[in-house]
């Protein structure tokens, strides 16, 4: 008999104490091997159910995504009318292809709206490859630094094993984007475009870099264990490793054509077909034309595992040594939604991080948690957002851009959002998606706004210096966008 709600806490306490006293005995009692006779019984039970028979007939003959797609729901949610949109069209549709650069695309797509407006352009892209090159170089060096700082931990520790698992993946966070732009600036894509076997298809390149970095990790850990390995020896080793990583990178990518403070010349034709010439440095281009002030953007998340109104920091996550840490302010969904609307009303697009491609129909470009009729086959999804995060069912995997929303006239809250993706024009409807409010609440985790767009009580969390952040480990789902 199960305990009543009144005695439930006492029951759990007693249960845990039994586990601690005799874990092997208790676990043995709770073990349950598969009973073949029960399989036959279960099969008879399910096969006698007409609903189960219909479901299995359909799923054995058709693709599950196609068969369970609720087309009535799809048609209802595929509404492309938005009463709050940014004034500048973001063209052309970008395509990250077979790379994990979504964060760089979402961030540069946001800033290119400023360039399009400032220079009266019809089409424009910032060079994602320029930032990608330096991100790889910086991440490799950041990894080596993490190996040195964790040298006191056992090689089999969770931290060291996590660091070794993927030293220099393509992913990243908005604060990591800011770290790159502050150091290297921005340039037009016309000056430094993608390459087919490195930037747009990075798997092999990543594999070779990873192998070399793991070798370097062993070298550093071995040297640090030797008493004779003073600081100068480690620094010399690090410089040799940096040189070799740069050499490997130069095999796969051209070196960026200009240094951050070096002047480049860019010619372009505006909407009126007038020819212009710009002379600028990458750092100047970022501030003057892309209108980026790196001190103003802040990240907010909705993570119901932790108290709202608290700062959250992802430990050890970064790319540029000495750069800003990954820090968010945790708020409720209503606050996130209102900030998105406010920013769009100020004619600014919103960088956001979500769990993609959960409940996303790539053919039509609709993101809605009720698109697929899973209950029709007896498959229900009762877990709440906090539980999904805890049990690794939800995590931040993809960054995109919100460029519009439709606000209800009565509640003043958004009903749906216009989303710009970076998977090319054949994904969604010409590269654009519509996201429902319910999807936003369940599978959107992060947005980026300017600190002056926050209410004073929220802005002060970032500026007061009195807030101690909740520190989450580098492998936490809230850091997964950087994978």
Curated annotation (Swiss-Prot):
It holds the Pfam family Peptidase_C1_2. Gene3D superfamilies: Cysteine proteinases. It catalyses: Inactivates bleomycin B2 (a cytotoxic glycometallopeptide) by hydrolysis of a carboxyamide bond of beta-aminoalanine, but also shows general aminopeptidase activity. The specificity varies somewhat with source, but amino acid arylamides of Met, Leu and Ala are preferred. One of its GO terms (molecular function) is cysteine-type aminopeptidase activity. InterPro entries: Papain-like_cys_pep_sf, Pept_cys_AS, Pept_his_AS, Peptidase_C1B. Inhibited by E64, a specific inhibitor of cysteine proteases, N-ethylmaleimide, iodacetamide, and mercury and zinc ions. Disulfide bonds: none annotated. Residues 1-30 form a transit peptide. One of its GO terms (biological process) is response to toxic substance. The normal physiological role of the enzyme is unknown, but it is not essential for the viability of yeast cells. Has aminopeptidase activity, shortening substrate peptides sequentially by 1 amino acid. Has bleomycin hydrolase activity, which can protect the cell from the toxic effects of bleomycin. Has homocysteine-thiolactonase activity, protecting the cell against homocysteine toxicity. Acts as a repressor in the GAL4 regulatory system, but this does not require either the peptidase or nucleic acid-binding activities. Belongs to the peptidase C1 family. This is Cysteine proteinase 1, mitochondrial.
């Amino acid at each position: 008999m199960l305990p009543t709600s009144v005695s439930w806490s006492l029951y759990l306490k007693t249960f845990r104490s039994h586990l601690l006293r005799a874990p092997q005995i208790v676990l043995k009692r709770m073990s349950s091997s598969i009973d073949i006779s029960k399989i036959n019984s279960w099969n008879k039970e399910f096969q006698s159910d007409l609903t189960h028979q219909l479901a299995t007939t359909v799923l054995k003959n058709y693709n599950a995504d196609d068969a369970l797609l609720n087309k009535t729901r799809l048609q209802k949610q595929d509404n492309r009318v938005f009463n709050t949109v940014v004034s500048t069209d973001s063209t052309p549709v970008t395509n990250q292809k077979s790379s994990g650069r979504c964060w760089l695309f979402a961030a540069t797509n946001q800033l290119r709206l400023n360039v399009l407006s400032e220079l009266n352009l019809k089409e424009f892209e910032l060079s994602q490859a320029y930032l990608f090159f330096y991100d790889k170089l910086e991440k490799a060096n950041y990894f080596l630094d993490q190996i040195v700082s964790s040298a006191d931990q056992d090689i089999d520790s969770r931290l060291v094993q996590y660091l070794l698992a993927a030293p220099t993946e393509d992913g990243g966070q908005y604060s990591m984007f800011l770290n790159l732009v502050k150091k290297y600036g921005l340039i037009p894509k016309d000056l430094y475009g993608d390459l087919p076997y490195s930037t747009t298809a990075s798997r092999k390149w990543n594999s070779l870099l990873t192998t070399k970095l793991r070798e370097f990790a062993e070298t550093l850990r071995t040297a640090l264990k030797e008493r004779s390995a003073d600081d100068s020896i480690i620094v010399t080793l690090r410089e040799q490793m940096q040189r070799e990583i740069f050499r490997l990178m130069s095999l796969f990518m051209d070196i960026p054509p200009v240094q951050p403070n070096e002047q480049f010349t860019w010619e372009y034709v505006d909407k009126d077909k007038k020819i212009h010439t710009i002379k600028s440095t990458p750092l100047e281009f970022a501030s003057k034309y892309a209108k980026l002030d790196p001190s103003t953007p802040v990240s907010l998340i909705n993570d119901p595992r932790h108290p709202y109104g608290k700062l959250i920091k992802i430990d050890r996550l970064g790319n540029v040594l000495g750069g800003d840490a990954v820090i968010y302010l945790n708020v409720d969904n209503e606050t996130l939604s209102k900030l998105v609307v406010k920013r769009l009303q100020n004619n600014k697009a919103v960088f956001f991080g979500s769990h993609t491609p959960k409940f996303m129909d790539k053919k039509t470009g609709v993101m809605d948690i009720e698109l697929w009729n899973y209950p029709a086959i007896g498959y229900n999804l009762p877990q709440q957002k906090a539980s999904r995060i805890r049990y690794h069912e939800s995590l931040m995997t993809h960054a995109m851009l919100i460029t519009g929303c439709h606000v209800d006239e009565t509640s003043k809250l958004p009903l749906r959002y216009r989303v710009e993706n970076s998977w090319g024009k054949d994904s969604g409807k010409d590269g654009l998606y519509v996201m429902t409010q319910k999807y936003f609440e369940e599978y959107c985790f992060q947005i980026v706004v300017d600190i002056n767009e926050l209410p004073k009580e929220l802005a002060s969390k970032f500026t007061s210096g009195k807030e101690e952040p909740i520190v989450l480990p580098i492998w936490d789902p809230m850091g997964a966008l950087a994978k």
